């Protein structure tokens, strides 16, 4: 269970807090108050997003125009307002408080008295209950500070275990060598007094606001209290078949180690019917939550609309068996379920090199000895060290609760100064692994399968190419980079999920600013690893240039994919393709004469062009996908009308299908299946992009029909099923 926490923010609203200065990455003019409130708004927004009822907040303003606090009748507590009493904040509460957080013209009031009010608020709210108590002070140090009774205040802070955090706007910082220019003398004195006051408080913090503001650019990872997932015995051998002296049993507990974190998800809402003139922004005031209502029907001619509504409780479970449904009662279903009981049983050991890394991508869990039992702690530590010293992993059968499906897990040693135990990760079953037949990168097989080719000038890399690629990989090795203080350039602690934190920051910013038209940019730390390290790319330039030369890499410009309007192209007597290739070729005048002779017969002209396109199309059987895309783009570029483009594309799709049929007939077994599926997927993507899905559907239908008839080497039901899924 999360700890209860109470935080009171004391905000200095002195007139000087309205001073504007250029701040931030964009050097935008902003007041001291608005600059400082960014941290407070962010912290309160995090508490609102967490939704914890036990994480409460209060707000106190100092140097205000009015006086509203529990000590308002006493001297020295004037011009201090409790803007918001301690409570669970929501967006409405925050927006209401935001209206009152503005600099005031009345400079009367005392910051230290504001801290006393905050202490009393926390004492009255938390009483003697177990709470984390915080007071956060935001000031620029130019207001009044009466430290005459500082000893009594410090005693109250320490006795109530209140953590005092003071953030000073433009306070001097010797560690980063920052000193404010032209600082007023009274501000310098206030800084020294305030620092001495904070240093005498236990577990308190005195910092420049810049430190606090910079911390906002570092995403905060949600702290999660561990919840036990399993408690039982780690058993080696079968206690039901072996005598007790041949069975090892260690009392253990299982806790989560890694779990996939997910980003915030949007929910469905409906706009309420409010007059347009009264709607300014789509806030929660004019949004209504959508409720789901599911109804169940069966076809019934005697019912209303030919359907009969059913109650959810009357439905039964069934399993599909072909086109039929096999009905199994609840009693029968319980009988056929695999009976299991909670257990963690070792079934063997393997060398850690025999476990592929890609099998360890799931969530992981810690295994520790039962807390409070030294024997179990020592036993699990010895077991972990034995695995570590022999370079082995353990395999175990794991059932976390009675009746749950069993899992096969791999047990890995986890040895740290603070803990010695095990970490386990679930392994896939045979049905979970997707096995694909992928072509080799270093050799080729002939169509007959009788010969293996290891050298090919165009399809296989040469030794020089492989060596150049090795050099490039070595040049881009991240382990050579060092960050500050010789720390690694890339650490897991700095790898944040951009989607999680960016969505969270956008929601917070839009909620607080109420400006839904301005989306903040992602934090720099979230985009830090979106590009290779600049230092490495500079060092690896020679290796990259060599690769470009050896692989003959050229920049490809994206061509237009579709035409919005039909363009009329005049006869120029020149071949555009020849011009682009540097070859000047004049078209035959006879083609112009033929064009003029058949103007009265458009059908003949279209057929002639289609026939001409048919003769020009040619695809490399060993390089179908790139050639297909290149040819389709050329047809798109040369076509002067949608009809001409569709005709050429249809012809290309037919020829490609014919090529796939030939490849299938000449292959052995299912050797060509993956390549055929890949080509068809490319054809589908290009058809969708060119807005001719019907052309692809027709070509695919022709191919499937031949497969179903067995015209291409017998029945190939597996391939048909894969094609139909495209």
Swiss-Prot record:
Listed Gene3D superfamilies: 1.10.1600.10, 2.40.290.10, von Willebrand factor, type A domain
Chain segments carrying region Disordered: 591-620
GO molecular function: ATP binding; ATP hydrolysis activity; damaged DNA binding; helicase activity; telomeric DNA binding
Top-tier EC class: hydrolase
Any GO BP annotation: double-strand break repair via nonhomologous end joining
Subcellular location: Nucleus; Chromosome, Telomere
Low complexity bias (residue ranges): 605-618
Enzyme Commission designation: 3.6.4.12
GO cellular component: chromosome, telomeric region; Ku70:Ku80 complex
Catalyzed reactions: ATP + H2O = ADP + phosphate + H(+)
Coiled coil: none
UniProt-listed Pfam families: Ku
Alphabetical UniProt keywords: ATP-binding, Chromosome, DNA damage, DNA recombination, DNA repair, DNA-binding, Helicase, Hydrolase, Nucleotide-binding, Nucleus, Telomere
UniProt domain Ku: residue ranges: 248-475
Keyword Hydrolase included in the entry's annotation: yes
Subunit description: Heterodimer of Ku70 and Ku80.
Annotated family: Belongs to the ku80 family.
Function: Single-stranded DNA-dependent ATP-dependent helicase. Involved in non-homologous end joining (NHEJ) DNA double strand break repair. DNA-binding is sequence-independent but has a high affinity to nicks in double-stranded DNA and to the ends of duplex DNA. Binds to naturally occurring chromosomal ends, and therefore provides chromosomal end protection. Required also for telomere recombination to repair telomeric ends in the absence of telomerase. KU70, of the KU70/KU80 heterodimer, binds to the stem loop of TLC1, the RNA component of telomerase. Involved in telomere maintenance.
PANTHER family in UniProt: KU AUTOANTIGEN DNA HELICASE, X-RAY REPAIR CROSS-COMPLEMENTING PROTEIN 5
Protein name: ATP-dependent DNA helicase II subunit 2
UniProt source species: Yarrowia lipolytica (strain CLIB 122 / E 150) (Yeast)
